């Protein structure tokens, strides 16, 4: 039993020496020295229970704070993607609405153009008929609103003979 106990004590002393070397390396670092020379560092050096409590608190709070920051980052990314998706949907709906309005205007413009063409052809035919009638009435010597005194053309002669 004594040999096992001696072996345990030797390993503990060796581990303690290694820990002391690590502590000296850490304490010799310039930033650690500056912190330990500050009033807060001196207070923590004089109150080990507060130091241990603060160390445990910081260690344990790292996980929830990390999860919270991950949640914030995930939410920000999700919001950005949602804004892009919503913006895409709004632009798509607006584009479809614009396309429908422009198609309706195109159909309406075709209808208006057709009505204007029919009106032009009908009006032109009526005016040509009225002009031809007045020419025939004016050449026969009848009193009418317009009395034309000119020589008759072959078209008028053929019209009169029929």
Curated annotation (Swiss-Prot):
- The record places the following residue ranges in the Cytoplasmic compartment, namely 1-42, 87, 131-162
Give the Lumenal compartment stretches of this protein: 64-65, 109
Q: Record keywords: Amino-acid biosynthesis included?
A: no
Localization recorded for this chain is: Endoplasmic reticulum membrane; Lipid droplet
Example of a GO biological process term: lipid droplet formation
Role of this protein: Plays an important role in the formation of lipid droplets (LD) which are storage organelles at the center of lipid and energy homeostasis.
Name-wise, this protein is Lipid droplet assembly factor 1-A
This protein's species is: Xenopus laevis
């Amino acid at each position: 039993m004594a040999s096992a106990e001696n072996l345990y004590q030797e390993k503990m002393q060796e581990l303690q020496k290694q820990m002391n070397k690590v502590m000296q390396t850490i304490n010799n670092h310039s930033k650690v020295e500056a912190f330990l020379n500050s009033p807060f560092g001196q207070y923590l050096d004089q109150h080990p229970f507060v130091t241990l409590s603060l160390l445990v608190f910081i260690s344990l709070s790292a996980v929830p704070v990390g999860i919270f920051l991950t949640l914030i980052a995930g939410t920000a990314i999700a919001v950005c993607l949602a804004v892009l998706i919503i913006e895409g949907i709004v632009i798509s709906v607006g584009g479809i609405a614009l396309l429908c309005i422009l198609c309706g205007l195109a159909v309406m413009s075709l209808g208006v153009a057709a009505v204007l063409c029919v009106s032009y052809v009908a009006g032109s035919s009526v005016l040509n008929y009225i002009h031809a009638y007045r020419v025939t009435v004016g050449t026969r010597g009848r009193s009418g609103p317009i009395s034309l005194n000119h020589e008759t053309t072959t078209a008028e002669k053929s019209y009169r003979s029929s």
